[in-house]
Every structure is written in structure tokens, then in C-alpha cells.
Amino acid sequence: MQFHGYEDLRSRLLSGELTCEQVISDYLQRIDSSRDDNIFTVVFHDEAMARARELDSKLQRGEAPGVLFGMPIAIKDNIAMKGAPLSCASKILAGYESVYDATVIKRMQAEDAIFVGRTNMDEFAMGSSNENSAIGPVPNPYDKTRVPGGSSGGSAAAVANDLAMVALGSDTGGSVRQPAGFCNIIGLKPTYGRISRYGLVAFASSFDQIGLLAANCDDAALVLGVIAGKDEHDATSSHHDVPEYDTAMDHVSVDGLRIGVPRAFFPESLNADVAGVVKAGLKKLEEAGAELVEIDLPESDYAIAAYYILVTAEASSNLARFDGARYGYRSPDSPDLSSMYVNSRTEGFGAEVKRRIMLGTYVLSAGYYDTYYKKAQQVRRVFQDKYREAFEKVDVIFGPTSPFPPFGIGDKMDNPLEMYLADVFTVPASIVGMPAISVPVGFDSLGLPVGAHLICNFFEEGKMLGIARHLQTLCQTAPSN
């Protein structure tokens, strides 16, 4: 059972050609057949089928279907859903169940979405390969010896393998966009504050955003329109109006579009295949009438350095709550309270999470706060100012999503600094809080996906999705098999 996007599925459901029960049963069978790929941490078999029957009955009663009627959706395992296990792919949250729904979950349920399961991820969203998961890595859909990217690797693989039509992810420094690039799908990080973070387990609160992974821009835009908007439970969510994203996309023309091409995004160290494929996509936009404008932006290396100081500092505070006292894993061999805290965290957290907690604690310590944390905040301000200036000259900023194609499982695990560079082109948008999207534009010489990365000004998701749709159409990348 295959569909040409959600509109195809919706029309077949509303015409009576298919039922939600048939569709969800088919998706669940495919999920079960892919169990060895470790894509899902939990599959909602009974819940999804019950929901499908409920929606079929709703349609039979003549009630109006919701905007997302019957859409099979996967949820990253760090977004709360009442009554469902929530682990963040970490041993320390073993056995924990959400006691409330995230705002995005409530809004999607209200529009008749169907959740098929939770997806694997890097532990607490810390990683770029999905290898930092307590339940093991996820293979890339195009080469099972390689990574799908991270930290939303399970969500990306679910969409690429057609196990969900859309998946929710979280993006702190590229965790939606980078795996989307590695898996040949769309990966959208909205403007900071566009989507409520209520119910998202915090990694770095001033960076975290819930994002979307989808096979095409239309499906991403549809879901974005449902989940975007102010939320009383999240003080950082924005009052900015939520437009009709499909209409905004339709008004976007490539002809006359000013595309900013930063020198910093095409360094000599960029993988030759990646550079060639991304530049070919840029050329197609130019041939369609776009104007290419070379612009100067701060070197991305500075963004990476500032980013890993700031996010680890925030993580060291946010993850202090996981101590074995109230929920999750508790070390069985602890003679006193202090030992219980130490042992539970030592045994419950993985190596990368512990590395980042220690780094964050260090940069916030009295003797180093000014040298590291304060300086990183100053660098963040410089990036914000420079990007605002850039958008006085251009409509969109263009570059590669990743400096290299999907790498082998295990290849970078012993070199965390090299792993961190996987996000070198995605981190700047997170530093400044602007919306960004990864768009599939082709394949390298080994047949591995390559993504292009677009950044737009604050709250210009509609324009960005319209440009991305043009680019994806021009490049006509093949679907995953």
C-alpha cells in the first residue's frame, strides 16, 4: 500500500476506497517486518488500531474529518504522550511512562492523527548518528552499514522506509535536518518559539525545537499548520500569527529569488561529492530564475565551538533532575542517598551524555564562566547580528546540510570532535533561532543521499517550504526503497 503524499491517502479514505483500519494495519505490518532495524522503541499496536476504528466510525457517522485524518505519525522518544513509555533512549528512564500529553500531541490528536509508535534516537538527543542509544543504532535506509544521522535517526528512518507518513523529531543543533539529509527526506526546524516545547524533554532549552520529518514539503506544511502557535504552557512560544502554509508556499516563485551563498558553507574541506551535488541543485535554481548572491557570514567553526559550550551548560542543569529518586532507573547497590544519586547517574547515563554533563559543569564553574560561557554567548550575539544583516540582501541562505555523506556505523564513535562536525552547517541556524530545512537534492558516487540546507528569516517557514518544494521538484530525488 503506497501513497503519493497525504492528500492521496486522505482522498482514498474519504472516498471509501480505504479505511483507516486497513491503512494502519498495513503500516503496523511493515513496522513489525522491520524490527531488526531498531527504528522504533515502542510500537502502539493496540492503541493505533483502536484509534483507526474510532476514526472510521466517525466518518461513518457523517462527522467532519480532522485536518490530519488517518495520517500515520511516528513520535521521537523524547516527546510526552500520556500513558506511553518515554525513555529518551536512555537506561535512566527505564520503565517511565508519560503522565501528560505534549502540546503537539494534543493538537495532532484533535485533528485525527494516528500515532504508530515511538522512534529510536541518540540518548537525550545528544548525538549525530543515533549510535548513542541505549537500545543500539539504527541503519541507514540506503546502506545498512551506515548511520541514518541523529539525533532523530529513528524518525528519519521511519519516514524514509515508509513506516510513517510524518515523524516528529527534536532539533537542538541539527537533529532533524542532518538525519533528513542522510535519509533523503525533508527535515524542518521551525523558528525558535514557533512550536510549543511543552512535553519535550529538555536538552538545551534555548535551542530545542520540535521539528518535522516528511517525504515532501506539502505534508510537512500541513502538520506544521496544526502544531504551530502560542501555548500557555510554554512561555517561549510565540504569539506570531500562524499563516496558511499551503497558500504561502503557492505564492513563492524562484524567478527573482535572491539566494545567499556563504563562502563559509563551501570550504575546501567539504566532501567533493557533497559539494558537487549541492552545487548542481543550486545551479538548477539559478537556471529557474534565481539570483545567486555571494555573502560573508562568520565561519561555522566558531558556531560549533560556541554551540557546544552553551548546550552542554544548559544540559548539565536540565539533566540534574534525573537522579533515580522519583522515576526511572535506580541503582540497586547504594547504601545511602548520596551513593544512590551517584550510582544511578553513573550507571543510567551513557558515555556521551556523561561527557556533555561534565563539560557543561566545567564551563559554568566559577573560574571558567567568563572565559567560556560568557564568551560563547557573545559569539551567539555576533551570529544573530550577522544573519539579520544578511537577510537585508537575500531571501534565503543556501548550503549543504552535512559536510560529508552518511558514514559507517562505528566510524566516528572514538572521535567525538569529528562527530560534532557533522552539524557544522546546521548549528548556525540554531544559534540564531531562524527556521531551516534540509531538502534532498541527489546522491553521491556511492548512491548515498545528499541534502541541501536552506535558512530563512524569522517566521518565514511558508516561504522556506515553498523554496524547498521548488528545489525538491527540480532535483527529483528518488524515494527510498
From Swiss-Prot:
Source domain of life: Bacteria
GO BP terms in the entry: translation
Signal peptide: none
GO cellular component: glutamyl-tRNA(Gln) amidotransferase complex
Pfam families xrefs: Amidase
Active site residues per record: 76, 151, 175
EC numbers on record: 6.3.5.7
Keyword list, A-Z: ATP-binding, Ligase, Nucleotide-binding, Protein biosynthesis
Entry keyword annotation includes GTP-binding: no
Membrane-spanning intervals of the chain: none
Gene Ontology MF terms in the entry: ATP binding; glutaminyl-tRNA synthase (glutamine-hydrolyzing) activity
Entry similarity comment: Belongs to the amidase family. GatA subfamily.
Name under which the protein is recorded: Glutamyl-tRNA(Gln) amidotransferase subunit A
Organism listed in the record: Chlorobaculum tepidum (strain ATCC 49652 / DSM 12025 / NBRC 103806 / TLS)
Gene, per the UniProt record: gatA
